Amino acid sequence: MNIRLYNARILTMEPGREVFYGEVWVKNDKIAYVAEQKELAEEWDKSQFPRIAWDIELDCKGNLLMPGFKNAHTHSGMTFLRSMADDLPLDQWLNKQVFPLEAKLTGEDIYELTRLAVLEYLTSGVTSIFDMYLTPDTIAEACLDTGMRCVLVSGLNNFSSSPKQVEEEFLKWNKKNSLISYQLGFHAEYTCSKELLWKVSEMAHHYRTPVYAHISETKKEVEECKARYGMTPPMFLDSLGTVSYTHLTLPTTER
């Protein structure tokens, strides 16, 4: 598909964050040309471009055209839980509100809730998401139907899915579609047995891929992990060879 976006203020993210008036051409899902309006007119007059049959021509009317935002931590199917019991500590919120309600969700529910979330993403300038939730196949279907780029993340835990299922999803979605990819992950240390985390670690080393999880989110989580294993969550997971770290809320000094 050939798309022409013109009459736009363009932010290219080059050093200096320069903004200029111009247009962008997209050919077969790739940006093929970006230029200021004056530069484009001069080159066009010199016939340096073949005449292109555009599938879509969009007048941006002076609005800003820029790379899309990337939301690196989403649970799209949880849109229905927004503002529900936000005043509870995390463990009570999960066990008294989230888990009981999630147990009632069907695949169709998650599909529609993900579509709702994608609507919010797209109208906020978010073009890619990193999504950990139930039924990854359903999330992928919703994202494909709406054109949203998505990295699926397995939310492996003691209560749903299995290492075998996660491995099958990993292999399926990392070769099927350019919009969808898949990364290994688990929900949290406190919802996974030590044996389950060993399996995740083995898969990560076998496929040479990162692992993603919720780690050290609350003081309660840290204290309970220390009681179970004599270590903080990062130290415990490090002892299994499971993860490296992106952001923590309660790291110890050595971490």
Regions found by a protein language model. Give the residues of each.
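Gly/lys/ser-thr-rich phosphate-binding loops in alpha/beta enzymes
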Residues: 19, 29, 33-37, 61, ...
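N-terminal metal-binding scaffold of metallo-dependent hydrolase/deaminase domains
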Residues: 1-49
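Alpha-helical scaffold segments that flank or form the walls of functional sites
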Residues: 82-147, 167-176, 246
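N-terminal-biased segments
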Residues: 64-100, 207-224, 232-244
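Metal-coordinating catalytic core of metallo-dependent amide/deamination hydrolases
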Residues: 138-245
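Divalent metal-coordination and catalytic microenvironments
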Residues: 8, 24, 29, 62, ...
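Single conserved hydrophobic/aromatic residue that forms the stacking wall/gate
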Residues: 247-255
